[in-house]
Every structure is written in C-alpha cells, then in structure tokens.
A protein has these predicted regions:
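A glycine-rich helix->loop->beta "capping" turn
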Residues: 67-81, 86
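Conserved active-site helix of classical SDR/Rossmann-fold NAD(P)-dependent CH-OH oxidoreductases
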Residues: 23, 115, 158-170, 179, ...
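Rossmann-fold cofactor-recognition segment
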Residues: 44-61
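Conserved glycine-rich Rossmann-like NAD(P)H-binding loop of the short-chain dehydrogenase/reductase
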Residues: 26-44
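Catalytic loop of short-chain dehydrogenase/reductase
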Residues: 83-87, 91-106, 127-175
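C-terminal helical subdomain
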Residues: 179, 183, 191, 195-241
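N-terminal Rossmann NAD(P)H-binding glycine-rich loop of SDR-like oxidoreductase domains
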Residues: 11-26
Length: 241
C-alpha cells in the first residue's frame, strides 16, 4: 500500500493529467485505481479498472459510486477534469465577449461537475483514518492573485470551485475528521487545455503530464487535515483565495 492508500479513483482518466495520475498512483504502490471517464479508453491493466462516469450525469456517478463502494472505502479521489476552451468557446479577453451559453458550459465543466462528484464520492472516504479528495483547480481562480483580468468564465468557475471545496471540507470534517478535501493547482502542463496558448508560454514554464502528476501525488502524500479546504500549488505552497 502506498502513502496515499490502497484504493483510489481518478476522474478524467483519459485526459493528459488524469491518465498520468492513474499511472503515478500505481507506480507508487496503490493497489487498485479506478480510472473513470466519459468514454472508457483507459486500458485495463493489473490494478487499473476503467469505468464510465460523466461528471454531469448523476445517474452514471451514482452507479459508479455504488459499484466502487461495494468493494470498500476509497483512500484517494482525484477529480482531474476541467475545460478552458471548446469548439466555439475561447477565454474572454473583455466583458463584451461574454456569452451566457459559453459561460454556462465553462461553469458546468469546472464547477458543477466536480461538485457532483464530491456529492457522490466524498461519502466513500472512511471515517476513522486519513483519506483525501482533491480536485484540479487553478491559480487564476484566486481572486486576490488576479492581476491581469480577462478569462471571465474560467476564472469565475475556478473561484466558485474553490468555494465548493471549502464548504465540502467543512461538511466532510464533521463526518470524517481525518479526511482532507483540497483544490490543487497543477501549474502549466503540456495538455489539450494549454495547447492553444503554447506559443505564449515562456520556455521551461510548462511541464509534461508525468511530471505534473508526480508533483501532485507528492503533495497528496503530505496533506494533513489542517490543510483541508485550501487551494494548494504543485509545490505544496498555499494559494490565497
């Protein structure tokens, strides 16, 4: 069993960071990793179990939680989902670019979906021992750290997600005082999310998904209950809300 437990679930397992997290958890000794995604493309391997679950489909989340929960509690849950852009949707540079349907889609992907995962999967954390749920957020969701403006929908959705994490941490502590619920900032990662902005990223400031995953798992290994509800960067530092 690894330092973050024997049983884990990763949402967004077919994404760059999510897939890397699945393999990093296994490499560090987690016995069983459930790899959840909307379309199962993760190959079944020793200790890696692919499952279909859509973060915006409560029936699929309930079914996945029931299936996994029947096998026992989870030591680690990681929600590695999110959306910055999509066909016809790009981050806004000015207020005049805000469109309600685009903003709703970004909020759904970055806040509503993870909140629904918490609703169904936080009850699977054990009551009497250390466990953790982490969701990928972003530094741009920090209100106090916003110096450049823009990216209205994405920034607001991540700020809302950070508030959901805080409230979920408070609620979870009443049932499972050793559990830790956090938002994680992975840094800039070579992925589909950052691809349209690659030319604007200074050399050396973007890392491979495998490096990002290793950093995040190290952070998870050292979490303690006093950090619950916080936004934590890949280097373990606390980001102010």
């Amino acid at each position: 069993m690894s330092g973050i437990g024997s049983r884990a679930a990763v949402f967004g397992a077919t994404g760059a960071i999510g897939g890397a997290l699945v393999h990093e958890l296994k490499a560090r000794g987690t016995d069983c990793v459930y790899a959840l995604s909307r379309h199962t493309a993760t190959a079944k391997a020793d200790g890696i179990i692919p499952l279909i679950a859509d973060t915006l489909d409560e029936d699929s989340l309930a079914a996945a939680a029931a299936h996994i929960g029947a096998q026992g509690p989870l030591d680690t849950v990681i929600i590695a989902t999110g959306q910055l852009h999509a066909p016809g949707i790009m981050p806004e540079k000015a207020l005049r670019e805000i469109r309600p349907e685009a903003m709703a889609a970004i909020f759904a992907a970055n806040c509503t979906g993870p909140a629904l995962v918490m609703k169904h999967f936080l009850p699977l954390l054990p009551r009497g021992r250390r466990a953790r749920l982490a969701v990928l957020s972003a530094r741009v969701g920090s209100i106090s750290d916003n110096r450049k403006g823009g990216w209205y929908s994405y920034r607001a959705a991540k700020a809302a997600l950070n508030m959901v994490v805080r409230s979920a941490a408070i609620e979870t502590a009443r049932r499972a005082p050793e559990a830790v619920v956090v938002a994680l900032h992975p840094g800039t990662v070579d992925s589909a999310l950052s691809l349209p902005f690659r030319s604007f990223i200074p050399a050396g400031q973007s890392v491979a998904p495998q490096i990002a995953a290793a950093r995040l798992v190290t952070v998870l290994e050292h979490l303690h209950p006093e950090q619950s509800g916080r936004l934590i960067a890949y280097d373990g530092s606390i980001i102010a809300p």
